[in-house]
């Protein structure tokens, strides 16, 4: 490719609405341009990187035995009504009517459509396993699209759906996709972690997220540096921090805590560690035709509630936070001084695992400006229902017993789910088993955010000059910068020769023949993030040298002119082989 025949739309300044590095750099590098909120044009530079991501994804999906198809972006409402997601999905699902007043959606995912394919095409266990995938544009009507392609409304996604006859087959399909994802993100040149996750609105009973590690990531990941353990903080098991409950050493005492409604303030006033205080959180579950059930969840003062874990407890699937009116009715006091002793009406108490092993702790007295110290289970309170209801923290013991938890930030770029029969039972997707009996198909679904990968890769790979692409997804692998291409025959001939040699070697190279000043050329290609640069100048050619600089290098080096193409081609191949 020659730059004079390409489109390079670099900008010196980022738009005012760009908040994060990837959004700023994708606009400045001429990769994207905004059309509407969360909707972008992908300019030639950006599209080249997208196509490279798609190629790697497609190769690894095919290698794993998946079969490519293409499903419509527009889907009839009837399919979503069958699955139950027409009512469940919410305003993110873009709905519209055609001229005949039929309801349709623009698909954010394709579980319903692919299940419809399967129920009409798969009749026997002999036709499974099968895994269909596509790479297609999706639409999710985000309430607040932001961060460029990281949280857009329209995006490109690879979504795959496996169908198996039994649980063993589903586990094998899931393993193949998990392994394929590891290969994909490794080939993309990204630092990533696969983490155990909650299945969210897709549903199902087992899932992993793939996160690109970046300080700007929206998701918190708990991992163990000395083992393979990693999980979304929402899903990570929090072990009890106290192995055994100590015997009571203090008497039950009501203490004045005027104006101290927070655990930190109470601990400071009483001159005790925050870890001896209890955070009381009041939840409610509604009962048709009767008053709600009120729950008191007890956490250690330095811990935070994990609502996803709570929602999985018996009776708490549809919980909500209690209103202040309900709190006063059940506890006799507003929030800030709540506790399990002396409630006005019965409440159900759940203690976090760590709280269940505490002794001589402090709780609210259910009276403004008072707490109770020296509280102990068994003596002052009945033994509680115990559950893991908190988020893990840095330093907690790893659930695999191999060290301590650390926390990092990640950007989710892939997700794999074992759906089981969630959609096949709802939509009647059955097959005849070996004995001729109809059985529901077992499904898995597997997504990769193709356009999101670009933003995530930039968040992980940039400096003050611009993007630093991994070779595998860079719009070009090598850029040739000739000094005076339009003025010097020697420079032009050397640049054209290098271009021909690199092209023949299969290297994705661009020759900057625009006639720009060196400073402009260098700034453009550093901003765009091409991994390798060769500078051809008359002075160097007289000495038989060509200047080379890798995008991550701080200094340039001189290469023999006759060896420059082979040397750089080998650098590219070595990087792609990692």
Swiss-Prot record:
Transmembrane segments annotated in the record for this chain: none
Keywords: Aminoacyl-tRNA synthetase, ATP-binding, Cytoplasm, Ligase, Nucleotide-binding, Protein biosynthesis
Catalytic activity: tRNA(Pro) + L-proline + ATP = L-prolyl-tRNA(Pro) + AMP + diphosphate
GO biological process: prolyl-tRNA aminoacylation
The protein's Enzyme Commission number: 6.1.1.15
Matching CDD domains: ProRS-INS, ProRS_anticodon_short, ProRS_core_prok
PROSITE patterns the UniProt entry points to: AA_TRNA_LIGASE_II (PS50862)
Localization per Swiss-Prot or TrEMBL: Cytoplasm
PANTHER family: MITOCHONDRIAL RIBOSOME PROTEIN L39/PROLYL-TRNA LIGASE FAMILY MEMBER (PTHR42753), PROLINE--TRNA LIGASE (PTHR42753:SF2)
Matching HAMAP family: Pro_tRNA_synth_type1 (MF_01569)
Role of this protein: Catalyzes the attachment of proline to tRNA(Pro) in a two-step reaction: proline is first activated by ATP to form Pro-AMP and then transferred to the acceptor end of tRNA(Pro). As ProRS can inadvertently accommodate and process non-cognate amino acids such as alanine and cysteine, to avoid such errors it has two additional distinct editing activities against alanine. One activity is designated as 'pretransfer' editing and involves the tRNA(Pro)-independent hydrolysis of activated Ala-AMP.
Family, per entry: Belongs to the class-II aminoacyl-tRNA synthetase family. ProS type 1 subfamily.
Name listed for the protein in its UniProt record: Proline--tRNA ligase
Organism: Burkholderia multivorans (strain ATCC 17616 / 249)
Gene: proS
């Amino acid at each position: 490719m020659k730059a004079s025949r390409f489109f390079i739309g670099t900008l010196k300044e980022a738009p005012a609405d760009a908040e994060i590095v990837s959004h700023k750099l994708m606009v400045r590098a001429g990769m994207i341009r905004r059309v509407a909120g969360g909707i972008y044009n992908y300019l030639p530079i950006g599209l080249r990187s997208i196509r490279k991501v798609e190629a790697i994804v497609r190769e690894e999906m095919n290698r794993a035995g998946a079969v490519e198809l293409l499903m419509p972006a527009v889907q009839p409402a009837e399919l979503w009504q069958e699955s139950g997601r027409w009512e469940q999905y919410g305003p993110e699902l873009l709905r519209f009517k055609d001229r005949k007043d039929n309801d349709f959606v623009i698909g954010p995912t394709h579980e319903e459509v692919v299940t419809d394919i399967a129920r009409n095409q798969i009749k026997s266990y002999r036709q499974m396993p099968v895994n269909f995938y596509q790479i297609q544009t999706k639409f999710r009507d985000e309430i607040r699209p932001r961060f460029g392609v990281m949280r857009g409304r329209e995006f490109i996604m690879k979504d795959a759906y496996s169908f198996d006859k039994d649980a063993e087959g589903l586990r094998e399909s899931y393993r193949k996709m998990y392994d394929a994802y590891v290969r994909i993100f490794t080939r993309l040149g990204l630092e990533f972690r696969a983490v155990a996750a909650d299945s969210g609105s897709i549903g199902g009973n087992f899932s992993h997220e793939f996160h690109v590690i970046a300080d700007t990531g929206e998701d918190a990941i708990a991992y163990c540096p000395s083992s393979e353990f990693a999980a979304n903080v929402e899903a990570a098991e929090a072990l009890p921090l106290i192995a055994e409950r100590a015997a009571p050493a203090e008497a039950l005492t009501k203490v004045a805590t005027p104006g101290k409604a927070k655990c930190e303030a109470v601990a400071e006033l009483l001159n005790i560690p925050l870890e001896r205080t209890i955070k009381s959180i009041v939840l409610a579950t509604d009962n048709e035709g009767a008053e709600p059930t009120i729950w008191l969840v007890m956490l250690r003062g330095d811990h935070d509630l994990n609502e996803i874990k709570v929602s999985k407890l018996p009776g708490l699937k549809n919980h909500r936070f209690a209103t202040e009116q309900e709190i006063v009715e059940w506890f006799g006091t507003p929030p800030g001084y709540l506790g399990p002793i002396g409630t006005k009406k019965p409440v159900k108490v759940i203690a976090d695992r760590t709280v269940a092993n505490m002794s001589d702790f402090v709780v609210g007295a259910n009276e403004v400006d008072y707490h109770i110290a020296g509280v102990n289970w068994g003596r002052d309170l009945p033994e509680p229902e115990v559950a893991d209801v908190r988020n893990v923290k840095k330093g907690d013991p790893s659930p695999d017993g191999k060290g301590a938890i650390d926390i990092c930030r990640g950007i989710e770029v892939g997700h794999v789910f074992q759906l089981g029969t969630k959609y096949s039972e709802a939509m009647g997707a059955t097959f005849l088993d070996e004995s001729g009996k109809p059985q529901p198909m077992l499904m898995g679904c597997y997504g990769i955010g193709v356009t999101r990968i670009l933003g995530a890769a930039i968040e992980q790979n940039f400096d003050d000059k611009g993007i630093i692409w991994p070779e595998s997804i860079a719009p070009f692998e090598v850029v040739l910068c000739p000094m005076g291409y339009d003025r010097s025959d020697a420079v032009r001939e050397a640049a054209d020769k290098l271009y021909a040699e690199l092209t023949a070697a299969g290297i994705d190279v661009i020759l900057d023949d625009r006639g720009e000043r060196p400073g402009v050329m260098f700034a453009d290609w550093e901003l765009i993030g091409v991994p390798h640069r060769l500078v051809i100048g008359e002075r160097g050619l007289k000495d038989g040298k060509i200047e080379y600089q890798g995008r991550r290098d701080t200094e340039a080096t001189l290469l023999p002119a006759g060896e420059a193409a082979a040397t750089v081609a080998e650098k590219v191949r070595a990087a792609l082989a990692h």
